[in-house]
């Protein structure tokens, strides 16, 4: 499975100093393979309390076999491969190989929809619990990395985090990732999510793919909650643009945009739970360094959580980026707090 990369430069900052800005790649987001998107809703209930390997009578067994699209199952093989690479769990590798062999069978070569035994779904639920903590940390590392790049990008490298991709030069990486915490962050991104370089990494962009967990157990509810708040925030951002007929308003004000404000607060809290204070100071000195406090959120040198050293457009761009990331953050922040 190939990951799409933008090839044509959208704009080029100072040559060799910062890097190159490309038109948007597929935006990092939470939505996973469409494995169960076209399966019957009953499958969620069927898999809720069923233990792995439970014996079932043959009568009605076909009704308990979800029908899924073949492309969705192909994407699931890719997801399982990522999980296996991150955990070296042989059971995950075995399931990946089993599903892959099934897809190569002559009987399903031309199929559009295929049926799976419920045990497959139950296994995926079990394996998601194994990889969940790793996925949470990997996603946090990528979010911190992208934030660090944007805040420290240099005055000649202006770009939008949502619609453009910044590919840092070797010089930029050498100058901006000197400390141990930043080196660790860079290594995580290079190893697990693939640093944008126009070449496919072993699991490039996969950190924004929560895996099948979004459909299983409480993750399904958390995902829907996150998307609902995310959609409200999208609407608020569009209204903000329409008021002044510009890409971003001339002032940064979220007082009438409660969904955006709530997303920033929750993302800030989760970010601070995930990274220690000394790490946050190294990542992005103007972003959520001091511990969250409701009373200080929009006073003094803070503007709705952002340092006032960031200009208005930077604050709007970061806000829009975190809104786009929120469906993931909602699941992982609930995990951290619960």
UniProtKB/Swiss-Prot annotation:
Tell me where it resides.
Answer: Virion
> Keywords of this protein's UniProt record, alphabetized?
Capsid protein, Virion
Grouped into one coarse class, the protein's main location is: virion
Q: Name one GO cellular component term.
A: viral capsid
Instruction: Report the superkingdom from the record.
Output: Viruses
Biological role? Plays an important role in virus transmission by the insect vector. May participate in the virus stability by binding clamp proteins and surrounding the pentameric turrets present in the virion.
> Mind telling me what this protein is named?
Structural protein VP9
Q: What organism is listed for this UniProt entry?
A: Rice ragged stunt virus (isolate Thailand) (RRSV)
């Amino acid at each position: 499975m190939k990951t799409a990369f933008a090839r044509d430069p959208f704009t080029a900052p100072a040559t060799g100093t910062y890097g190159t800005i490309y038109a948007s790649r597929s935006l990092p987001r939470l939505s996973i393979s469409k494995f169960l998107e076209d399966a019957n809703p009953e499958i969620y209930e069927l898999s809720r309390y069923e233990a792995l390997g439970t014996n079932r009578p043959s009568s009605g067994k076909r009704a308990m076999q979800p029908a899924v699209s073949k492309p969705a199952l192909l994407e699931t093989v890719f997801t399982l491969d990522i999980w296996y690479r991150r955990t070296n769990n042989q059971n995950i590798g075995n399931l990946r190989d089993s599903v892959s062999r099934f897809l190569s069978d002559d009987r399903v070569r031309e199929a559009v929809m295929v049926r799976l035994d419920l045990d497959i779904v139950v296994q995926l639920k079990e394996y998601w619990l194994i990889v969940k903590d790793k996925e949470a940390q990997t996603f946090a590392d990528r979010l911190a990395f992208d934030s660090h790049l944007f805040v420290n990008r240099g005055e000649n490298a202006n770009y939008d985090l949502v619609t453009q991709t910044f590919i840092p030069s070797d010089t930029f990486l050498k100058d901006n990732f000197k400390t141990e915490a930043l080196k660790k962050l860079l290594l995580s991104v290079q190893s697990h999510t693939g640093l944008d370089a126009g070449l496919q990494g072993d699991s490039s962009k996969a950190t924004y793919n929560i895996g099948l967990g979004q459909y299983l157990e409480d993750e399904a509810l958390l995902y829907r909650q996150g998307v609902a708040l995310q959609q409200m925030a999208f609407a608020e951002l569009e209204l903000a643009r329409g008021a002044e007929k510009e890409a971003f308003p001339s002032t940064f004000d979220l007082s009438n945009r409660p969904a955006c404000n709530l997303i920033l607060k929750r993302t800030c809290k989760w970010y601070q739970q995930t990274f220690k204070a000394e790490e946050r100071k190294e990542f992005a000195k103007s972003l959520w360094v001091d511990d969250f406090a409701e009373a200080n959120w929009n006073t003094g040198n803070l503007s709705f959580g952002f340092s006032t050293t960031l200009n208005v457009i930077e604050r709007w761009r970061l806000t829009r980026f975190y809104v786009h990331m929120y469906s993931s953050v909602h699941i992982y922040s609930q995990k951290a707090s619960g």
